Amino acid sequence: MYKIIAIDIDGTVYSRKHGVHELTKLALKKAREKGIKIVIATGRTISTTRLIAKKLDLLNTSIPFIGQNGGQVFSYETNGKVKIRYTKKFTNKQVNQIFNIIKQHKAHAFCYTLDENIAYKNKGISIFFWWMKKRSQRNVKVYKPNKKLESQITKYICFGKKENMRQMRKKVEDLGFSAFSFSYVTNAKENIEINPIGVNKGYGLEYVAKELNIKPEEILFFGDGENDLEAIKFAGTGVAMKNSKLEIVKKAADDITSLTADQGGVGEYIFKYVLKEEIPKEFSIKK
């Protein structure tokens, strides 16, 4: 019997085209009614996770969620406040080191900080920057190496030419930092997320499991991206989404959903293997 169902957001329970599928909403609701804890595990921040938690009726549950690829564990408490268990951050020396590498590889960088109202960027303007600024709703400041940070950096999102990004990724990984990439906008470009040393969703999921006194084999995890790999491996049952574009993710998983995120793949899987119930007739399942 599963005691935790952990879910990635983007490309797993949420798609850009269709949002959160109603079948997935219903399945998670029914799982909660059976006493199963629903844990969000995402690369998003507290504020952007809140939007999806609200759609899934997971606000104010006091259940710990995993944010920033495992760089943060927090909960939306019953009193409406946010309780933070931990937040991993970069030292000032590491921040300067990474910005120098970003400059060498002609990349654009957008950086989240401990303060949900502040972000940092490097010099220059791009469509990527404006998109991130709009999404994050933060006051964005330009990083200057000789000026003290107003809030410590917790995650970098970098964007540039694919070959430059690949070389940059190798450099930051050689220094021990966690890096996750996925194709973004065009085939010639790539988006890379950089987290502090040792940070990944598996680390976050292990922390949550210990807090809730739940064994790995009692955890069901759903994900589609490279940043889901360690959580897929840690969970007793790690499930990759049918729509995942990464073979490494599908090979690491114990199972693969029959449907995509657009089709309600998480919901269909939960109905079949967790609830063991027929899917309501109002849902037309097309495989």
From Swiss-Prot:
A Gene Ontology term for the protein's cellular component: cytosol
PROSITE patterns linked: COF_1 (PS01228), COF_2 (PS01229)
The protein's required cofactors: Mg(2+)
Record-annotated active site: D8 (nucleophile)
Record-linked Pfam families: Hydrolase_3
Keyword field: Hydrolase, Magnesium, Metal-binding
UniProt keyword rRNA-binding, yes or no: no
Residues involved in phosphate binding: I9, T42, G43, K201, N227
Name the record gives this protein: Putative phosphatase MCAP_0732
Organism of this sequence: Mycoplasma capricolum subsp. capricolum (strain California kid / ATCC 27343 / NCTC 10154)
Taxonomic placement: Bacteria, Bacillati, Mycoplasmatota, Mollicutes, Mycoplasmataceae
